[in-house]
């Protein structure tokens, strides 16, 4: 997958990390590929599994999982699962920009799991407070659409032509298009999540009526629905109970943190080391060492 190659090139240029594909490793399905992740000094950071394509019986969506978490000298086994269109014959898997950002997002979670250096697995990798867990993933999305990075991996699948500047310009413009709508639907889902976790009496509860009442109180117009409705809001039973707001809070953190890279260059080694040592390795405890200030939730 060219996009995975692009993502790998980004971490190689930032951290000196390499992914080496392993053959003959037992996996739970033939579609799963396995990579050994090595640091700049050649030491092993962990094993990375990718399961990118849909199949019968596989859940849809995208996520990162741990088969073994880092603890002391024990290195992690990390997996990214996605639902991208499978290659057919000589035609490779072609991704939309949304899917490319999903790949970079989940790879950011994987980096968090692979680069962690904690004494106890209960505090390693993604085992951090929900307010913080989406920072490593969402900041990694920024590299997906940086012009310098797009030219590394975004090439015509038949001719090999590098993506032209006029298309890059359109990609950058669409990143800010309709953001008011997207922020509103995310906020609506976050508030719905909070309201669900303040229910005290579940007897004869009509969930759809509950959702409508909650949204009516917000004054939400019918044309804008919560990003996730009560009938399929998987996050609230998948580790984000009363915590879906963390995606929006992570937007504050990741934009602030990425400014550090923009100030010095998106592949600046010193900035990358600061982010690695104070955010990815230690998990949520040293953010101010990266930016030297607290972030603010005020709009």
How would you label these PLM feature ranges?
Residues 77-82, 101, 189-191, 226:
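Elongated scaffold/linker segments in the mid-to-C-terminal portions of large proteins
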Residues 1-6, 289, 294-299:
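Single conserved hydrophobic/aromatic residue that forms the stacking wall/gate
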Residues 88-92, 123, 201:
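A generic structural signal for short coil/turn motifs at secondary-structure boundaries
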Residues 1, 94, 98, 179, ...:
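Short, solvent-exposed segments of well-ordered alpha helices
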Residues 28-29, 36-95:
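Active-site-adjacent "gating/activation" loops or surface patches in catalytic cores
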Residues 15-18, 25-31, 44-47, 106, ...:
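C-terminal, non-catalytic "cap/extension" segments appended to globular domains
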